[in-house]
Amino acid sequence: VRFAWQSRDEEVWGKYGYPTYGVGLYSGFLGDPEVFGNPNAVFGFINFPVSNPSRRNQFAIEPSLGLTYNLEPFDPENNPLNDAIGARMAVDFDLNFGWAYRWTPEMDLTYGIDFSHFSNGRSFTPNWGLNMFGVNVGLRYHYNADQRRTYKGMYPEEKLQSRYLRSEKTPNEKVADNQSINVYLALGTVQTEEGAGTDTRYGTFSLVMDYHHKFYNLHSVSAGLDYFVDNSLKETYTEGDGENSLVGIHAGYDFMFWRLTTVLHGGTYLTEKLGKDDFFLRPAIRYNINKWAYAQVGLKTIGFAADWVEFGVGFRPFRW
């Protein structure tokens, strides 16, 4: 179940094709409920239309992010069969590639394919996560909130248009101050596989310095250096004689909309890997507080598996 608002401001949203955005609720099942629970989720989403506004069958890309709850976590005594999730709550990420067929002036028939992922980023172990691919079919109802304010009653004198007549996407624009040096600091906490089901935890630290270049108002790239501290390595990589820090390099792509930025870094290590894979990824969500500072939540990975969740702040000390 989802509730959405239609964007209209040409200056802010026109360049993104006038997306809709909102909140939703999810309830589902994952095999044996005594092992995995019956997951429910609360999430936010944004729907980016791709098709020409004149087409009756519209294609859109819709990412969503939220929290899943009502899970049954791993317990060595009471729930040893659950080797996927070690916490009662997890992050819920979903990516939907969908179509909407304009059935009536108020109703759409929606259908698509989606990918969903539940994970807690090794904040608790085990954390193999849960991945789900599926198809979806639904109905979408459009209504105009001004109708009840302007023309009240069961038989209004005039019926306002329910469906928003979306305009063509406005051209991308180059932005001023399109280059910067960014400094990002983040903390995290992890469990090891040996510590699953216990209160034993280890702290992590990330320091990132990169060069950031914006091509247009939507797209940018970055490249830079990473410094990591993972205190769990003292337990998981005994050959390192207590070493717990790594240095790496990365390159990345950003997609920017409103004050939010979706970030994807890919990198490798310049120093000894200390038992980690050859490469790491960093998918993240960034909120721009102002031109000089931002808050960011991301996931640092080991290859394609979660390493730890980063909670941090960033600064742009140099912009030009």
Residues covered by each model-derived region:
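Outer-membrane beta-barrel "beta-signal"
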Residues: 131-157, 306-320
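Residues on the lipid-exposed face of transmembrane beta-strands in outer-membrane beta-barrel proteins
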Residues: 1-5, 44-50, 63-67, 95-101, ...
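Detector for outer-membrane/organellar transmembrane beta-barrel domains
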Residues: 176-265
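Repeated loop/turn-to-beta-strand initiation elements of outer-membrane beta-barrel proteins
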Residues: 9-12, 59, 101-109, 145-149, ...
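Transmembrane beta-strands of outer-membrane beta-barrel pores
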Residues: 5, 25-31, 65-73, 115-121, ...
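Transmembrane beta-strands of outer-membrane beta-barrel proteins
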Residues: 19-23, 59-65, 109-113, 135-137, ...
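Residues that define the transmembrane beta-barrel architecture of outer-membrane proteins
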Residues: 1, 17, 36-42, 57, ...
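Solvent-exposed loop/turn segments connecting transmembrane beta-strands
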Residues: 29-39, 55, 122-127, 195-202, ...
